[in-house]
Amino acid sequence: MSGRRPTLLVFCDSLSYYGPRGGLPADDPRIWPNIVASQLDWDVELIGRVGWTSRDVWWAATQDPRAWAALPRAGAVIFATGGMDSLPSPLPTALRELIRYIRPPWLRRRVRDLYGWLQPRLSPVSRNALPPHLTAEYLEMTRGAIDFNRPGIPVVAALPSVHIADSYGRAHHGREATARAITEWARQHGVVLVDLKAAVADQVLNGRGNPDGIHWNFEAHQAVAELMLKALAEAGVPCR
């Protein structure tokens, strides 16, 4: 990293780059990764997509050339996922993600509409999108692979956020099990955690976030950034 600014390597779901009105470019200064990087005087490599779970982070870390390029100059790595892992999913993730590939288009639209109708009705009795033990397993696989290539690099992870989304029937009964699994994994491997619920609950649960009931406003992004900076300092990153 000599002669170059360190990079904050962030693996995330859409919570990290959505604001109160929708998705934002990765360089928007109001989202928490850029607030954190600005305070550190670092660059950011933001790798994520809507709906990503910890399994997707594993795939990204091992298959995305942006991650390969960023890791040698990374000053720290953040796993900002877990929210989608803990959300209820009436269909197994593999089947749900196949909807986009259905042909012809008219049939795809009908299937998507049907799923959109079923999801809020079945979510209260559905299992997590990713079983908690798999969340922990994929996080450790990713952490281990990163540590193999960059021994001792500071790693921070997150506990799931909260939501009041009607699209999920406002159900989030899987959060606690996912949070426990992540907490135990972090304890075993010395990973510092940020509790996203603690940062954003006041904004989200009181209806001050995105109207979808899942994503955040910029006050929540600022609160997350503050907790991330504290966690990075605890993990050994010198903060200004």
UniProtKB/Swiss-Prot annotation:
Q: Which GO terms describe its molecular function?
A: diglucosylglycerate octanoyltransferase activity
Q: How does activity depend on temperature?
A: Optimum temperature is 45 degrees Celsius. Activity sharply decreases above this temperature.
Pfam families hit by this protein: Lipase_GDSL_2 (PF13472)
EC number(s) reported in the record: 2.3.1.273
Going by the UniProt record, its keywords in alphabetical order are: Acyltransferase, Transferase
**Which enzyme type, at the first EC level?**
transferase
State how it assembles.
Homotetramer.
* Family membership noted in the UniProt record: Belongs to the OctT acyltransferase family.
Family matches, as NCBIfam families: DigluglyOctase (NF043016)
Please identify the protein, giving its name as recorded. Diglucosylglycerate octanoyltransferase
Species of origin reads: Mycolicibacterium hassiacum (strain DSM 44199 / CIP 105218 / JCM 12690 / 3849)
